């Protein structure tokens, strides 16, 4: 069971220092993939192992999970993976993150908290203001991948991203993964659970234009 954390809590107003790319990674020149809401980070650990030609950054709002993930990175001496604790909206909207955002080539939102009650929609990670921040900072060609097993949440995320002029939908059938990064080659724990239980998965790809 996922532990729900209120991202609007004042506890997340203070942002930890974001290291430079050279501090986070062995080779700061590699393309950078960002996973928002990375949980324990197993998805990124697997990606970092499968595709070593990229750097990976995970943002997670549960501090204990981030501490454990950082310890694993240290123990395994992984040079292309880093984790940051906090609210992604606050972190990426902070001035110290601007340079990092401009180096991001793709972002994934995998099975984010649905926050089913309407009064809690404002707690969802994808908000119009957040998408505006991304549209203003991301380079052209940057990809966004969303994936969920909750149809209502998918529709909400799709409307929110699609309403921003700077992002266009890409038909998955026409998307050439050989020419771009493919985070879908690795499945999250939630996705494996959904597949085993034959639950529908809703996903979409967007590009910054």
UniProtKB/Swiss-Prot annotation:
Pathway: tRNA modification; N(7)-methylguanine-tRNA biosynthesis
Lineage: Bacteria, Bacillati, Cyanobacteriota, Cyanophyceae, Synechococcales
Organism, as annotated: Prochlorococcus marinus (strain MIT 9215)
Gene Ontology molecular-function annotations: tRNA (guanine(46)-N7)-methyltransferase activity
Name of the featured protein: tRNA (guanine-N(7)-)-methyltransferase
Role according to the record: Catalyzes the formation of N(7)-methylguanine at position 46 (m7G46) in tRNA.
Residues that coordinate or bind substrate: 117, 149
Similarity-based family: Belongs to the class I-like SAM-binding methyltransferase superfamily. TrmB family.
Residues forming the catalytic site: 113
